[in-house]
């Protein structure tokens, strides 16, 4: 079992943790999140981005992690970036707790997300269905108020 964590923080009140667990290279990865300080009663996009570089804040993380050269999509779509995790829902206080399994996100192997950045966005991910060019790149999820590098967890 490989475990990883991203400690989320940035130039906003958004903070928290996103954890990853994968039993072996052929099993889905369980992704769990506990994020606070976001907009109340909202859906907000989150993605694994290409680089683990946060020297210029979350903008240094680059585009979505996309080793297979696909366009942006929903986590359940065949046509999607590896880093496309969709949206999480916040409660009346702006907090979000949840988990999901993902068959493309890996901690083991050549396409591992270890050392890359998990970015929490300011807007809702349109899952590549926005009808414009940016939708197929970013899901129109907006600015990057918080992020964290995905590192090996104890």
Swiss-Prot record:
Entry GO CC: cytosol; mitochondrial intermembrane space; nucleus; superoxide dismutase complex
Top EC category: oxidoreductase
Record's keyword terms, sorted: Antioxidant, Copper, Cytoplasm, Disulfide bond, Metal-binding, Oxidoreductase, Zinc
Catalytic activity: 2 superoxide + 2 H(+) = H2O2 + O2
Region annotated Disordered, chain positions: 125-147
Record GO biological process: cell redox homeostasis; copper ion transport; fungal-type cell wall organization; intracellular copper ion homeostasis; intracellular zinc ion homeostasis; negative regulation of cellular respiration; positive regulation of transcription by RNA polymerase II; protein stabilization
Pfam families per record: Sod_Cu (PF00080)
Binding-site positions, Zn(2+): 64, 72, 81, 84
Annotated InterPro entries: SOD-like_Cu/Zn_dom_sf (IPR036423), SOD_Cu/Zn_/chaperone (IPR024134), SOD_Cu/Zn_BS (IPR018152), SOD_Cu_Zn_dom (IPR001424)
One function term, GO molecular function aspect: superoxide dismutase activity
Sites where the protein binds Cu cation: 47, 49, 64, 121
Quaternary state and interactors: Homodimer.
Record's protein name: Superoxide dismutase [Cu-Zn]
Organism, as annotated: Aspergillus niger (strain ATCC MYA-4892 / CBS 513.88 / FGSC A1513)
Gene: sodC
């Amino acid at each position: 079992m490989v475990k990883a964590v991203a400690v989320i923080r940035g130039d906003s009140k958004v903070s928290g943790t996103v954890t990853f667990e994968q039993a072996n290279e052929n099993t889905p990865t369980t992704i769990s999140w506990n994020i606070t300080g976001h907009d109340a009663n909202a859906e907000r996009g989150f993605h694994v981005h290409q680089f683990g570089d946060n020297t210029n804040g979350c903008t240094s993380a680059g585009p979505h992690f996309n080793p297979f050269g696909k366009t942006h999509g929903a986590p359940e779509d065949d046509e999607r970036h590896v880093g496309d995790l969709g949206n999480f829902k916040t409660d009346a206080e702006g907090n979000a707790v949840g988990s999901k399994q993902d068959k493309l996100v890996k901690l083991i192997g050549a396409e591992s997300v270890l050392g890359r950045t998990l970015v929490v966005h300011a807007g809702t991910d349109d899952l590549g269905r926005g009808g414009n060019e940016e939708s197929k790149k970013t899901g129109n999820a907006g600015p990057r108020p918080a992020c964290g590098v995905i590192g090996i967890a104890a």
